[in-house]
Amino acid sequence: MKGLILVGGYGTRLRPLTLTLPKPLVEFGNKPMILHQVESLAAAGVKDIVLAVNYRPEVMIETLKKYEEKYGVNITFSVETEPLGTAGPLKLAEEILCKDDTPFFVLNSDVICDYPFAELAEFHKKNNAEATIVATKVEEPSKYGVIVHKQGTSKIDRFVEKPVEFVGNRINAGIYILNPSVVDLIDLRPTSIEKETFPQLAARESLYSFDLEGYWMDVGQPKDFLSGTCLYLSSLSKKNPEALVPTSEPYVTGGNVLVDPTAKISPQAKIGPNVVIGPGAVIGEGARLSRCVVLANSTIKPHAFVKNSIIGWNGRVGRWARIENVSVFGDDVEVKDEVYVNGGRVLPHKTISGNIEKPEIIM
């Protein structure tokens, strides 16, 4: 089988982290975001994976080529000379995606969930569909484009963008399985699969939706990255609890704590719930961490407080410092002792010596 991951562009919503690495290589749950998807595709029997990229492909090629042998897949980079939207990349990769008549998966690189690739393929085949969209239920459908089905079926009738009145609560989850014939509907230009291709398929009654069970999150911006981390850790606690630090560990409070084995943590620290600590990180005594991500080689000094924030690589948070309210630090940021940061977006290589009392970008 084949799969295409829409990697896309600059990752501006996740800056300042993406000033250092392309978004798919930023660690989510202590491994590059895109690796979650490559692993899941490989586990479902996918052998050919195409990455549609238009920003810094050389960094990704170097990193991802080493995963080919590990997962038994062929990874091809399809490099766009201009951004081609969500449908154009399929046409650009037509030679691989349409090399035989079997269907292929397409997914957005920002999406984190329990990827249901095997079940999706079975559903697609059973319904003799031309295209199948994974759908997820949301509490506030008025914020999204909503899927409307033909009554009593999983066949899609139409899409309603940000409906004022309730028409349904299922939205496009950014994961598809498509027959090669779908590529014939696409031109090699910047084009949207959601707005241009899917309505054509719905009109010929060959577009279906598959309901996703479990969690789903588009983690393309910091607050959603943190929410997605909580959902991922919660899923891990049910499906692979041995991956998490046991709650019997002295420093764990509240559970759902994921720590790289090379991190050094004081038994007198208080960590949790919903914390990820990367390789080489050092957490001092009395430090208090909750609902946060600490990336590789960062140091949280004694009695510092970090909540609802992302500490970038090689960061240093001083004694008794307080970091909260979706603060995001780029690479190599230092916060001095006793400094308060409230919602600061701090660019790489900065030193923060005074309080940041309201959310702002620190250049």
From Swiss-Prot:
According to the UniProt entry, where is the signal peptide? none
Query: Where does the record place it?
Result: Cytoplasm
* MF-aspect GO terms: GTP binding; mannose-1-phosphate guanylyltransferase (GTP) activity
Tree of life domain: Eukaryota
Spell out the CDD domains in the cross-references: M1P_guanylylT_B_like_N
Q: What class of enzyme is it?
A: transferase
| Major place of residence | cytoplasm
A biological-process GO annotation: protein glycosylation
Q: InterPro entries this protein is in?
A: GMPPB_C, GMPPB_N, Mannose-1P_guanyltransferase, NTP_transferase_dom, Nucleotide-diphossugar_trans
Gene Ontology CC, one term: cytoplasm
The record's listing under Pfam families reads: GMPPB_C, NTP_transferase
Keywords assigned by UniProt? Cell cycle, Cytoplasm, GTP-binding, Nucleotide-binding, Nucleotidyltransferase, Transferase
Catalytically driven reaction(s): alpha-D-mannose 1-phosphate + GTP + H(+) = GDP-alpha-D-mannose + diphosphate
Q: What is its EC number?
A: 2.7.7.13
Give the pathway annotation.
Nucleotide-sugar biosynthesis; GDP-alpha-D-mannose biosynthesis; GDP-alpha-D-mannose from alpha-D-mannose 1-phosphate (GTP route): step 1/1
Annotated family: Belongs to the transferase hexapeptide repeat family.
Q: Tell me, what does this protein do in biology? A: Involved in cell wall synthesis where it is required for glycosylation. Involved in cell cycle progression through cell-size checkpoint.
Name of protein? Mannose-1-phosphate guanyltransferase
Organism this protein belongs to: Yarrowia lipolytica (strain CLIB 122 / E 150) (Yeast)
